[in-house]
């Protein structure tokens, strides 16, 4: 028995060592291929491209592959690592040689490096993340959250169809096809309609296959939908469609700004897809998982909904109060953002607090089961604020008041002051909602069903949620600034 116990640690060490070797070699191989491809596209030295791809792939395989437990998780971790590479390495090199340059000049240099961002995401982060995620999924036998093909096909396929029909009908009324921006201009109208629906269906179907284990409720589905939609903007309008159309790739800021409106369209579609997927997935869970008496809630759904609306309204009001000084200082409150309609300061503040209360109620419904700690509540609040900046002042508000929307980069840049107000509002709303919820839960933790519910809210170790927050927030904020 003693000899067996001495052997077991050695076997474990050898398995960990072999896993690191396998992940490192796979990351190295895919990274070299991706680095050489991005070197050809950007016309960079093959040696530099080789070293960059090899180094990124090797480091990702050694330090991040253990978190890539599925293709979807690997994809998100790979994209966030590629974004971090673009932000840190070139920025560090620039700062070392900046010699006191003005911030405006550094912003211009960052705009010049936008093609590198596209290359890092598509040639390094995406393929390396997916490859190591597939390897991790084959190696991982997750008994607690097994992958269900039926759930992925039903929820992903039908949500892609439903959201594609809704989004397609909405865009069709304005004769606008953002999901196929970059496609040939001489295409017929029926061809554009078909292609847009096909792209929407593809995004929806792959969403369920990639992120089934990661999404929980409406809030996380919308967050993952936002991040996945941003990736598809890089894949589709910036790369794939121009290649199919026979035009030259233009990854510069000027070229990408021509299809910036498509980015907003992709984000809105991602949000619609997230809501549709969460609805269908919840129906599946209710039918096949929560029908088990051991997993039933201790409270009725109506009571939980009413309580979430109450907490959300109070949290939203507090968020509106705390974000109002920034809104007043930037001149956002006296105006209906971007519409040129002037209001008195008192009227603008009252309208801001009223809207903040209603938006807080939506946070209570959408994100009530997402945050398990104070830090995660603030992160989801940031995502919530970013979502409503794209959905509110960029889309719904002008659409309701004027019947038109302006998604040009110049128009969106003028709304940047309200973006930071939305982020502060979202973070405060998320934190306040968590405090109210935790205060209530602390009085009912003796109920074993409450304890089980809290345990289900905890995300497993290595969850890609932090990577999603970094990727979605980073690009959701950076792209409007770069294109302004």
Task: Explain the meaning of each model-derived region.
Residues 2-484:
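Juxtamembrane/disordered regions of integral membrane proteins
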